[in-house]
């Protein structure tokens, strides 16, 4: 996956989460449906669990529900 594709995917994920506390499954379905061909369930999962969550851009509110952090909002501004 190229850097530009990663950035597009991360931006889409953060935009969906910014709309409110969203369930993981809804975020995944919306992202895979609206992004380009490179956005598969596997690439979504890797970006979400291996990058956004561990680096503090997204935080877990309750089981399966996530929200964007201030750090995540800064990243979204940079990507926009």
Question: How does the language model describe each region?
Answer:
Residues 1-20, 80:
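Short alpha-helical segments that sit at the start of domains
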């Amino acid at each position: 996956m190229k850097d530009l594709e990663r950035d597009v995917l991360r931006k889409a994920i953060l935009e969906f989460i910014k709309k409110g506390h969203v369930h993981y499954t809804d975020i995944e379905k919306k992202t895979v449906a609206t992004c380009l061909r490179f956005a598969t369930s596997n690439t979504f999962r890797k970006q979400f669990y291996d990058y956004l969550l561990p680096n503090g851009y997204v935080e877990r509110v309750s089981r399966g529900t996530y929200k964007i952090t201030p750090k995540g909002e800064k990243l979204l501004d940079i990507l926009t």
